[in-house]
Amino acid sequence: MKHLHRFFSSDASGGIILIIAAILAMMMANSGATSGWYHDFLETPVQLRVGSLEINKNMLLWINDALMAVFFLLVGLEVKRELMQGSLASLRQAAFPVIAAIGGMIVPALLYLAFNYADPITREGWAIPAATDIAFALGVLALLGSRVPLALKIFLMALAIIDDLGAIIIIALFYTNDLSMASLGVAAVAIAVLAVLNLCGVRRTGVYILVGVVLWTAVLKSGVHATLAGVIVGFFIPLKEKHGRSTAKRLEHVLHPWVAYLILPLFAFANAGVSLQGVTLDGLTSILPLGIIAGLLIGKPLGISLFCWLALRLKLAHLPEGTTYQQIMAVGILCGIGFTMSIFIASLAFGSVDPELINWAKLGILVGSISSAVIGYSWLRVRLRPSV
């Protein structure tokens, strides 16, 4: 029991469980004995009905859209705390992850197009390597435990959130045919209610969560990625202490173990099961997977490092306190873990054209993401000295 307690008390434990869940998913998806069970589990229909409102999705989408909204709620709470009281409190510090995220979206997209511009079909996947999977990136960073400076973790979180917001905007503008304006209107009203609650100093967490559920449902029905609702709710929950207690910090403390030991491992298990059946070297070296691999493995760190360097040279931003430029470069490599958001964009880009392209895109995403995870982790392990 002592060893078990020590494991769960470790900062790296959540990342270890997430990696185990991802490996288990890969093994099950590629085993004849378990692949059927694995995919049946993900396709299990789950229906929620309240009056005339009905949400009918399979298990995979409930995990990605509902449970991950809770993860994004936690991320929103942590980033808000750092924006108001921590390492992102000044304008120049806050500008740094914004500039990094812009570079991390532009350069991978351009590199992908360098491989695929001549093909009008695969060209549509230009946004695939522009995305970062914040859950897996943070999971890999967590493997390094307490030696990771808090400012570096917050930088990655802020960068990845901005990256995700950029991906959501790209999806809405380029990959979504039908946006429900009525649902977006309901979402706008819910956001206004959250703002009023915050301004009035309401501190009951349940009230914010209730409005958050309405917001999540509206965003889901609108056609925009529903996890965005979690970030929005997190930003409106009061951080300022009253009678020595902070609503946001208290909720952050409650959510952390649930996210680290249940939601993220379940997310990894549901999304990492990519089938390798039919994979060939010729297919892997075709322009589609090559463009994705290059975009994630080279474009992401190059874009983030280049734009960060320019921001520092032009004195537009400061390095996060206690970090080095080499560590920022390593985080840029971790941002090449595109995974689920990249797979989602690939399904939108090629789903109605040629489903076979989705499989090759997934392979490119898998190779690029795993390579980014291994190289980024190794570089950071060298650059970060264990705390004493």
UniProtKB/Swiss-Prot annotation:
InterPro entries from the UniProt entry: Na/H_antiporter_dom_sf, NhaA
Cytoplasmic side: 1-11, 81-96, 131-154, 201-204, 237-253, 311-339, 381-388
Periplasmic side: 32-58, 117-122, 177-180, 223, 273-286, 351-357
An example Gene Ontology biological process: regulation of pH
Catalysed reaction, written as an equation: Na(+)(in) + 2 H(+)(out) = Na(+)(out) + 2 H(+)(in)
Keywords: Antiport, Cell inner membrane, Cell membrane, Ion transport, Membrane, Sodium, Sodium transport, Transmembrane, Transmembrane helix, Transport
Compartmental location: Cell inner membrane
TM annotation in the entry: 12-31, 59-80, 97-116, 123-130, 155-176, 181-200, 205-222, 224-236, 254-272, 287-310, 340-350, 358-380
Bilayer topology annotation: Multi-pass membrane protein
Gene3D superfamilies xrefs: Na+/H+ antiporter like domain (1.20.1530.10)
Cross-referenced NCBIfam families: NhaA, PRK09560.1, PRK09561.1
Record-linked HAMAP family: NhaA
Function, as annotated: Na(+)/H(+) antiporter that extrudes sodium in exchange for external protons.
Classification via PANTHER family: NA(+)_H(+) ANTIPORTER NHAA (PTHR30341:SF0), SODIUM ION/PROTON ANTIPORTER NHAA-RELATED (PTHR30341)
Sequence similarity: Belongs to the NhaA Na(+)/H(+) (TC 2.A.33) antiporter family.
Protein's name in the database: Na(+)/H(+) antiporter NhaA
Record lineage: Bacteria, Pseudomonadati, Pseudomonadota, Gammaproteobacteria, Enterobacterales
